[in-house]
């Protein structure tokens, strides 16, 4: 198993698919990385040489924010919005949808399990 950006990526999958196991790398970035390094898309991880794995590792470290750094950056962005007291920050603070979705019905994922209200029977 190759270890890239602190993640064990599966050895029997294609490189483009295996790179997507890293938080912050999706299909487009995975293809971009393999093109930069010069690895064919159909090559499997267990067929990579140590030099190629090192090239992939260096390309990711140099050009992308992934894993813990990305999670930390997103958390800091949300905290900044909350500290500013802007509308988006208030919505985050109250655990409500941030991007304009309706909340009268729906929004159960963000709000949590429905709380029963006593005396609401007909």
Curated annotation (Swiss-Prot):
Gene3D superfamilies for the chain: 1.10.8.50, 30s ribosomal protein s13, domain 2
Q: Which GO terms describe its cellular component?
A: cytosol; small ribosomal subunit
Which Pfam families does the UniProt record give?
A: Ribosomal_S13
Q: Name one GO biological process term.
A: translation
> A single GO molecular function, which one?
rRNA binding
Region Disordered, residue ranges: 95-122
Q: Which keywords label this protein?
A: Ribonucleoprotein, Ribosomal protein, RNA-binding, rRNA-binding, tRNA-binding
Which InterPro entries does the annotation name? Rbsml_uS13_C, Ribosomal_uS13, Ribosomal_uS13-like_H2TH, Ribosomal_uS13_bac-type, Ribosomal_uS13_CS
Keyword tRNA-binding listed: yes
Give the family this protein belongs to, as stated in its UniProt record.
Belongs to the universal ribosomal protein uS13 family.
- Biological role: Located at the top of the head of the 30S subunit, it contacts several helices of the 16S rRNA. In the 70S ribosome it contacts the 23S rRNA (bridge B1a) and protein L5 of the 50S subunit (bridge B1b), connecting the 2 subunits; these bridges are implicated in subunit movement. Contacts the tRNAs in the A and P-sites.
Oligomeric form and interacting partners: Part of the 30S ribosomal subunit. Forms a loose heterodimer with protein S19. Forms two bridges to the 50S subunit in the 70S ribosome.
Give the protein name, as stated in the record. Answer: Small ribosomal subunit protein uS13
Organism this protein belongs to? Methylobacterium nodulans (strain LMG 21967 / CNCM I-2342 / ORS 2060)
